[in-house]
UniProtKB/Swiss-Prot annotation:
GO terms for molecular function: peptidyl-tRNA hydrolase activity; tRNA binding. SUPFAM superfamilies: Peptidyl-tRNA hydrolase-like (SSF53178). TRNA binds at residues 16, 67, 69, 115. InterPro entries: Pept_tRNA_hydro (IPR001328), Pept_tRNA_hydro_CS (IPR018171), Pept_tRNA_hydro_sf (IPR036416). The gene is pth. The active site is at 21 (proton acceptor). Its EC number is 3.1.1.29. This is Peptidyl-tRNA hydrolase. GO terms for biological process: protein quality control for misfolded or incompletely synthesized proteins; rescue of stalled ribosome. It catalyses: an N-acyl-L-alpha-aminoacyl-tRNA + H2O = an N-acyl-L-amino acid + a tRNA + H(+). The record marks 94 as: Stabilizes the basic form of H active site to accept a proton. Keywords: Cytoplasm, Hydrolase, RNA-binding, tRNA-binding. The lineage of its organism: Bacteria, Pseudomonadati, Pseudomonadota, Gammaproteobacteria, Enterobacterales.
Amino acid sequence: MTIKLIVGLANPGAEYAATRHNAGAWYVDFLAERLRAPLREEPKFFGYTSRINLEGEDVRLLVPTTFMNLSGKAVAAMASFYRINPDEILVAHDELDLPPGVAKFKLGGGHGGHNGLKDIISKLGNNPNFHRLRIGIGHPGDKNKVVGFVLGKPPVTEQKLIDEAIDEAARCTEVWFKEGLAKATSRLHTFKAQ
């Protein structure tokens, strides 16, 4: 099993670019930059895309330009066009249940209230069995404050921790392709930015 599509979830537009909800896109942007594969807008996939080579594997990158709750439209369009199965997809997203500075890989599961994941599961035929990269953004402590929190910008100290976790997640993604998911998971899950 190998990953053929890496997706970074986000809301489109400059006003959302620096908000916590866009952490998934920050990861894909970082990966694209690290591998010198600039993202370009591709309307038929409703997003920005690129193509990278990891250990001889052809991998597509995607940052949807739809709003978060319509992310599945972009993911399904690309998966269908390139005949990519759900278990060959890695979706990077912001995660309230992990603190800033932590990121974890996960296969399958629910959507945990995340509207981007919810729409992807739905558009993939109610199939939740894709890989996720959960990027910790922390929790406001009160569920009524979640919307304002994810659509807010993290303070500089938290942004630094999130950026370090994204850097490590990108390195661990490369480890995944070189040495397998178990090795990559073990390394990423013991990492915590200070």
